[in-house]
């Protein structure tokens, strides 16, 4: 299996970040990749509010990632934010593509070097 890693910088706009996913997924497909991995916060970069963009796994952002994967016949792993408890979010990886549909919620949050993921992310 050939895979691609898209080490990109996402911004604050989830729609613009979908454009990045589409762009780099197309490039990965052109190189013969069957799977492309995006960063954990590709939906919206850390450092911006997260609870206002969190959505369930069947929401429009995740469905657009599914559509990109389906149209390219490519497995995509992309980090998004889903609703957590008490107004927080979950740091979720969506894995979608031909023959696969699953997700993973991060459980070991990064609280070090002045960054406290646990202040806004639920584990």
What is each model feature region?
Residues 7-24, 58:
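N-terminal phosphate-binding loop and adjacent alpha-helix
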Residues 12-15, 53-57, 112-116:
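Short, flexible loop segments at the rims of nucleotide/cofactor-binding pockets, characterized by
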Residues 3, 17, 25-54, 69, ...:
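Active-site beta-strand/loop signature of hydrolases that rely on acidic residues for catalysis
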Residues 58-84:
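A short, hydrophobic beta-strand-centered structural micro-motif
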Residues 63, 67, 84-123:
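Active-site catalytic loop in hydrolytic enzyme cores
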Residues 21, 56-62, 119-121:
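Charged helix-capping and loop-helix junction motifs
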Residues 9, 42, 81-82, 109:
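Catalytic metal-binding/acid-base residues of hydrolase active sites
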Residues 1-12, 92, 103-105:
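Active-site-proximal beta-strand elements of phosphoester/diester hydrolases
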